[in-house]
């Protein structure tokens, strides 16, 4: 029999921190050393940021900050975006995933676990279980891409860690209805993929891009979006003139959140 999972019960409407792995059950544990970018007692978790009271719930959005996998830039990326999305009807979950020396695969397992949890408790969060999107900024978007490419559906952490024992939460799909790449792409750190065949075989969800022309990865973003589009995936692309890397929730010259809301609302309504 598959062992039952044991995690915090949701507190809908009230902010909450939810730890993703039970003690001793996190896939791919490593010996702690001083070279780590998180403290020894760090545990992957997500922060639930509820829809504003009185606002109709549209669905859920998982948010993963950038930071080159050496820090999580939540104050510039995820927190201000969550504030905007909460007012627009989205239950937001800021995922505090593992950093170096863990790999983007292990970080993607943290995100997949978070997606499964939100889907399992969809009724409590007043969402349709299909209406879950993942959004990442820079390295956080690379992590989201890793998750939707390789750690979706019924793929469990046992595919990466042979010692991992799946629990009942692993029986829940880790699929997403959409992905947002905010100054990011499918690939690895600093290297966007243009593997059309991989994208085609992966049955990617609709993909949203927002980036600026002054970003050092500007041409890689364009090439990545073109390859994803060539693979037959629905792509929404917003390029902001003169904008650099790291504009977070946007400004008057990179106001991507309303565009994302319009796009995602249509996806959720037609799920």
Regions found by a protein language model. Name each.
Residues 73-75, 80, 95-129, 249-255:
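Catalytic nucleophile-loop/oxyanion-hole region of alpha/beta-hydrolase
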Residues 187-188, 213-219:
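Acidic catalytic loop of the alpha/beta-hydrolase fold
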Residues 57-67:
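Short beta-strand element of the alpha/beta-hydrolase
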Residues 65-70, 213-214:
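Active-site glycine-rich loops that stabilize anionic/oxyanionic intermediates
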Residues 208-211:
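Short beta-strand/loop motif that positions the catalytic acidic residue
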Residues 225-271:
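C-terminal catalytic histidine-bearing segment of alpha/beta-hydrolase fold enzymes
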Residues 113-203:
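Primarily recognizes the serine-hydrolase "nucleophile elbow" in alpha/beta-hydrolase
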Residues 2-55, 104:
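N-terminal cap/lid segment of alpha/beta-hydrolase-fold proteins
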């Amino acid at each position: 029999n598959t062992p039952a999972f044991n995690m915090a019960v949701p507190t809908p409407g009230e902010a909450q921190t939810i730890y993703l792995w039970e003690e001793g059950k996190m896939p791919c544990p490593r010996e702690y050393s001083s070279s780590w970018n998180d403290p020894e007692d760090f545990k992957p978790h997500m922060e639930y940021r509820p829809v504003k009271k009185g606002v109709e719930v549209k669905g859920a959005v998982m948010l993963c900050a950038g930071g080159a996998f050496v820090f999580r830039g939540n104050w510039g990326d995820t927190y201000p975006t969550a504030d905007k999305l909460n007012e627009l009807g989205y239950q937001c979950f800021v995922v505090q995933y593992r950093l170096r020396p863990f790999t983007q695969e292990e970080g993607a397992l943290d995100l997949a676990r978070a997606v499964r949890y939100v889907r399992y408790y969809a009724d409590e969060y007043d969402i349709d279980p299909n209406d879950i999107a993942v959004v990442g900024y820079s390295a956080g978007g690379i992590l989201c891409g890793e998750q939707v490419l390789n750690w979706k559906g019924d793929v469990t952490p046992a595919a990466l860690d042979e010692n991992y024992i799946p629990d009942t939460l692993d029986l829940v799909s880790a699929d997403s209805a959409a992905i947002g790449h905010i100054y990011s792409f499918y690939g690895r750190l600093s290297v966007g993929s243009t593997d059309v065949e991989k994208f085609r075989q992966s049955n990617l969800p609709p993909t949203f891009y927002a980036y600026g022309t002054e970003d050092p990865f500007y041409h890689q973003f364009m090439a990545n979006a073109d390859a994803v589009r060539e693979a037959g995936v629905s792509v929404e692309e917003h390029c902001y003139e003169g904008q650099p890397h790291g504009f977070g929730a946007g400004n008057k010259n990179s106001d991507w959140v309303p565009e994302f809301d319009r796009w995602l609302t249509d996806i959720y309504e037609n799920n």
